[in-house]
């Protein structure tokens, strides 16, 4: 199996699209339903990259990134924000938290895959 990508989104439909797109390109995908679930799984699983939604219950994407960046082993792990938010202020907030990239929903799977391959080749 290829590199491991954690797909974090409260929408089962979006997680399914991420799973199909990334697994079809040779990535191993680990799913999480929100930031807290992602941190719990990250404590027991090593991953190479994360794709996360911004607006989620329990812990949003910004707080998730901030928490991930506290761990020395994940300080430089690529993290892509996948969100409906397109305002420049939100992008700056994401970048300040440590996001490596930003994709606005709705998105084409090919667009996501191009960004993932550029940041974290399988």
Residue positions per predicted region:
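Conserved acidic segment of CheY-like receiver
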Residues: 2-13, 18-22, 50
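Short hydrophobic/Thr-rich beta-strand motif most characteristic of the beta2 strand and flanking loop
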Residues: 26-33, 41
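Active-site beta3 strand of CheY-like receiver
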Residues: 45-51
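Active-site residues of response regulator receiver
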Residues: 53, 83
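Receiver (REC) domain active-site loop signature in two-component systems and cognate sites
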Residues: 56
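C-terminal output helix
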Residues: 107-116
């Amino acid at each position: 199996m290829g590199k491991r990508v954690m797909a974090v989104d409260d929408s089962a439909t979006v997680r399914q699209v991420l799973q199909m797109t990334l697994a079809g390109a040779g990535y191993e995908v680990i799913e999480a339903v929100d930031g807290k679930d992602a941190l719990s799984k990250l404590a027991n699983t090593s991953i190479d990259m994360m794709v996360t939604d911004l607006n989620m219950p329990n812990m949003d994407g910004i707080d998730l990134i901030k928490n991930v960046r506290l761990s020395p082993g994940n300080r430089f792990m690529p993290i892509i924000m996948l969100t409906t938010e397109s305002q420049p202020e939100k992008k700056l907030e994401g970048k300040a938290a440590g996001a490596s990239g930003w994709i606005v929903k709705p998105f084409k799977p090919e667009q996501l895959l191009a960004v993932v391959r550029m940041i974290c080749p399988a």
